[in-house]
């Protein structure tokens, strides 16, 4: 999203899988509903403790997301699961830094952009689970505030939708790329 806002002439189309705009994420995840994104709050903390905590139980930490966010246990065969977890454990610092940025510099930049009415000018496609029905928000409306040229499509899949529904995701990306700006 940031690349599309900062470099609109270089981004011909933007495809988003199962996330909300950063500013809206923090606005809608409040109270008990925030438990679905507890990891965001952990990784938003100052440098040091989150990294140590995650490293202490790295395989269990990353494995818990595979277990909770997939809707089909066959999505990640054992070898793929092991590779995903090992790669994530080896990238703890960068993963945490990326998440930490969503609660600091990314958030500040999004607030500034919203204040001046900056939007994504390219075609934007968002495909996601229907979190709004569970958590009480309209994801398409949240995205439309940032992207007037929006295609929004809910999908019956877990967070790892590209792995669970590859044909549907490929079709979505093909359709979106056909709308790319020249």
Question: What do the predicted segments below correspond to?
Answer:
Residues 2-156, 162, 174-181:
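Flexible "cap/lid" subdomain of the alpha/beta-hydrolase fold that forms the substrate-access gate
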């Amino acid at each position: 999203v940031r690349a599309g806002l900062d470099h609109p002439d270089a981004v011909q189309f933007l495809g988003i899988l199962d996330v909300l705009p950063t500013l809206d994420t923090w606005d809608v995840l409040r109270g008990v509903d925030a438990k679905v994104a507890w990891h965001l709050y952990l990784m938003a903390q100052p440098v040091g403790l989150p990294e140590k905590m995650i490293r202490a139980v790295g395989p269990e930490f990353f494995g818990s997301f595979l277990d909770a966010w997939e809707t089909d246990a066959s999505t990640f065969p054992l070898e793929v699961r092991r590779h995903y977890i090992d790669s994530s454990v080896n990238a703890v610092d960068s993963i945490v830094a990326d998440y930490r940025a969503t609660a600091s510099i990314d958030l500040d930049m999004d607030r500034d952009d919203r204040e001046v009415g900056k939007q994504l000018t390219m075609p934007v496609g968002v495909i996601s689970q229907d979190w709004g029905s569970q958590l009480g928000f309209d994801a398409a409306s949240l995205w439309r505030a940032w992207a007037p040229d929006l295609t929004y499509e809910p999908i019956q899949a877990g967070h790892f939708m590209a792995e669970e529904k590859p044909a549907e995701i490929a079709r979505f990306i093909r359709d979106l790329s056909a709308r790319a700006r020249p």
